Curated annotation (Swiss-Prot):
The active site is at 36. Mg(2+) binds at residues 16, 53, 110. Pathway: Cofactor biosynthesis; biotin biosynthesis; biotin from 7,8-diaminononanoate: step 1/2. Keywords: ATP-binding, Biotin biosynthesis, Cytoplasm, Ligase, Magnesium, Metal-binding, Nucleotide-binding. Belongs to the dethiobiotin synthetase family. GO terms for biological process: biotin biosynthetic process. This is ATP-dependent dethiobiotin synthetase BioD. Its cofactor is Mg(2+). InterPro entries: DTB_synth_BioD, P-loop_NTPase. Substrate binds at residue 40. ATP binds at residues 12-17, 53, 110-113, 170-171.
């Protein structure tokens, strides 16, 4: 399977936001499908659960699919997917999630939480990445403490022998902390800064990295 897995240092670091940019870039050169195999904290609208992150991914894509295809497992509880599924008596397994990720085109899969967040019964996001065997994009909120968060995520990925496509420092608010320079002293991973005021630099860097991933 060809694709990317979007993970990060935790929740609310901008995974979906960065994923949309990567998807929009990739749609310029190939057909892209998206998958959010499981999503918690879905809104209940007239008895139907609405996965907001999966909807955003779908809008960035150039292939129209049903939201149930994009996000197979939806939970209303604001908790980990593992806890949310168990609360409903559903034994969600790694095989279930792998099956929910399958696509016949290049696929961008967004996980839930960080690499070591539980996502199914005795299953972490890292287990899912291993199973579908695609490069991982690590999204880190670029703030004080980002160096530690980035290195923890990179070390976790390396421990599980995952292929790191890039680490994206998401500057939700532009800053001069210099985290990119600090992180590069401790890793050979590709470090890219997302800054709304310098999108061209971000696009140039991701183009080089993603094109290299595509020809592997």
């Amino acid at each position: 399977m060809k694709g990317l897995f979007i993970s990060g240092s935790g929740t609310n670091v901008g995974k979906t936001f960065i994923a949309q940019y990567l998807i929009k870039f990739l749609t310029n050169i190939l057909k892209v499908r998206v998958r959010k195999p499981v999503e918690s904290d879905c809104k209940n609208k007239n008895g139907k659960l609405i996965p907001k992150d999966a909807l955003l991914l779908s809008k960035a894509c150039n292939i129209i699919e049903s939201i149930d295809k994009i996000c197979r497992y939806k939970f209303q509880a604001c908790s980990s997917a593992q806890i949310a599924s168990q609360a409903l008596g559903l034994k969600l397994t790694l095989d279930d999630l792998v099956d929910a990720c399958i696509a016949d085109e290049f696929v961008v899969v967004e996980g839930a939480g960080g690499l070591l967040s539980p996502i199914a019964t005795k299953t972490l996001n890292s287990d899912l990445v291993q199973a579908i065997n695609v490069p991982v994009v690590l999204v880190i909120k670029d703030e004080l403490g980002a160096v530690n968060q980035a290195l923890l995520s990179i070390n976790a990925a390396q421990h599980y022998k995952l292929n790191i496509s890039m680490v994206v420092l998401n500057q939700i608010y532009p800053n001069l902390l210099g985290n990119e320079k600090e992180i590069t002293q401790y890793t050979n991973a590709n470090i890219v800064v997302f800054n709304q005021n310098d999108l061209k630099s971000f696009e140039r860097q991701i183009e080089k990295i993603l094109l290299a991933d595509l020809i592997k």
